[in-house]
UniProtKB/Swiss-Prot annotation:
Pathway: Cofactor biosynthesis; riboflavin biosynthesis; 5-amino-6-(D-ribitylamino)uracil from GTP: step 1/4
Lineage: Bacteria, Pseudomonadati, Pseudomonadota, Gammaproteobacteria, Enterobacterales
InterPro entries noted in UniProt: GTP_cyclohydro_II, RibA, RibA-like_sf
Binding residue positions for Zn(2+): 54, 65, 67
Enzyme class: hydrolase
Active site residues according to the UniProt entry: 126, 128
Organism of provenance: Cronobacter sakazakii (strain ATCC BAA-894) (Enterobacter sakazakii)
Keyword field: GTP-binding, Hydrolase, Metal-binding, Nucleotide-binding, Riboflavin biosynthesis, Zinc
UniProt xrefs under NCBIfam families: PRK00393.1 (NF001591), ribA (TIGR00505)
Catalysed reaction equations from the record: GTP + 4 H2O = 2,5-diamino-6-hydroxy-4-(5-phosphoribosylamino)-pyrimidine + formate + 2 phosphate + 3 H(+)
Gene Ontology cellular component terms for the protein in this record: cytosol
Binding site for GTP: 49-53, 70, 92-94, 114, 149, 154
EC number(s) from the headed UniProt entry: 3.5.4.25
Protein name: GTP cyclohydrolase-2
Family indicated by similarity: Belongs to the GTP cyclohydrolase II family.
Length: 197
């Protein structure tokens, strides 16, 4: 295990009451959070989302991405299903950090796409490591997942890490004139499955 379960408390939201579970990475001390809705024990696959931290989209309502829209839609879908988990993965800006994300935004303002901007800053298109999320699922007792994602890479990495993904559930929300190029780039260059949005 790369992390430990540290604390938990109720978290009332507009979609209902979740249990917020805090985790800490053993090597770095970095914290991550799971939001659990309903009873996730048992043998039925759990509806789940691995959501990477996005301060600009999740908290500041940015229209540059679809992250905030996906966060809200995932919580709504989980609550409607009556049970599920959202892992809030603290890897801001596809794990380049907030300040580098702002630098990448500045490059995008100059005409670079999201992948080119990361490359200009010396990063891969996506620096995230989802293997930690498999440990979070395991610590929550979740083995089988219906994963809310448009990113096939998440499915592959979680499967390789021992989580049985029985279904990929599309989460296509939030397209607008400010993020069309960003979403088109994610589909064309990063393999995200965004048809229908």
């Amino acid at each position: 295990m790369q992390l430990k379960r540290v604390a938990e408390a109720k978290l009332p939201t507009p979609w209902g009451d979740f249990l917020m579970v805090g985790f800490e990475e053993l090597a770095t001390g970095q914290d991550h959070v799971a939001l659990v809705f309903g009873d996730i024990s048992g043998t039925e696959p759990v509806l789940a989302r691995v959501h990477s931290e996005c301060l600009t989209g999740d908290a500041l309502f940015s229209l540059r991405c679809d992250c905030g829209f996906q966060l809200e839609a995932a919580l709504s879908h989980i609550a409607e299903a009556g049970r599920g988990v959202l892992l809030y993965h603290r890897q801001e800006g596809r794990n380049i950090g907030l300040l580098n994300k702002i630098r990448a935004y500045a490059l995008q303002d100059q005409g670079y796409d999201t992948v080119e901007a990361n490359h200009q800053l010396g990063f891969a298109a996506d620096e995230r490591d989802f293997t930690l999320c498999a440990d979070m699922f395991k610590l929550l007792g979740v083995d089988e997942v219906r994963l809310l994602t448009n990113n096939p890479r998440k499915v592959e990495i979680l499967t390789e890490a021992g989580i049985n993904i029985v279904e990929r559930v599309p989460l296509i929300v939030g397209r607008n004139p400010k993020n069309e190029h960003y979403l088109d780039t994610k589909a064309a260059k990063m393999g995200h499955l965004l048809s229908g949005n």
